[in-house]
Amino acid sequence: MKVIAFARNDLGTGASRRQRIAGLTPGIVYGGTAAPVNISLDHNALYHALKKEAFHSSILDLEVDGKVEQVLLRDFQVHAYKQLVLHADFQRVDAKQKIHVKVPLHFINAEISPAVKLQAGIISHVATELDITCLPGNLPEFVEVDLATLEVGHSIHLADIKLPKGVVAVIHGGEDNPTIATAAVPAGKVEEAAAAPAAAAAPAAPADKK
């Protein structure tokens, strides 16, 4: 995925405001052995790119004044109530050095799982992204979580996920095998199921004598 940008020398709040009025978004490229470079990007192109999931978790080819570098989107700021991207940060990557990044989780086969198909359960996504490390060439756009065998009362944990080659999950909070998804029957359905046998066992009301 390619991103076009231009180096900028006018810095400060006033300069950034003028950039936005002109339809540009200020940004910065940093990392590696080169010095940080302040850049400008076309606002509309950046705004629409940010809507794409892959833009947030892929190696990008950033062209600045004709020179192309491989980067990751590391941060961006948007206006509180306007459809306006205020700033974007990109980090250079080295093909030989591992990167640390979050990638989205894609949940598949929920509709054929026993929890949904046979037990009228609801699957809850405890996590929606995964912290990983890998070489840039091994970076996946997303990681799949297969729910095909999930049953009510059970969970999918990190150890159940097949990670792509060269990808290692980063675990936080001291939990060795965090929960990724769970399956349960909604409270209302549990009450209905419990009430049904009781209703069946209740004696019929005597008929009125005429």
Swiss-Prot record:
GO terms for cellular component: cytosolic large ribosomal subunit. It comes from the Bacteria. SUPFAM superfamilies: Ribosomal protein L25-like. Pfam families: Ribosomal_L25p, Ribosomal_TL5_C. GO terms for biological process: translation. Keywords: Ribonucleoprotein, Ribosomal protein, RNA-binding, rRNA-binding. GO terms for molecular function: 5S rRNA binding; structural constituent of ribosome. CDD domains: Ribosomal_L25_TL5_CTC (cd00495). Belongs to the bacterial ribosomal protein bL25 family. CTC subfamily. NCBIfam families: bL25_bact_ctc (TIGR00731), PRK05618.1-2 (NF004128), PRK05618.1-5 (NF004130), PRK05943.1 (NF004612). This is one of the proteins that binds to the 5S RNA in the ribosome where it forms part of the central protuberance. Part of the 50S ribosomal subunit; part of the 5S rRNA/L5/L18/L25 subcomplex. Contacts the 5S rRNA. Binds to the 5S rRNA independently of L5 and L18. This is Large ribosomal subunit protein bL25. It comes from Herminiimonas arsenicoxydans. The gene is rplY.
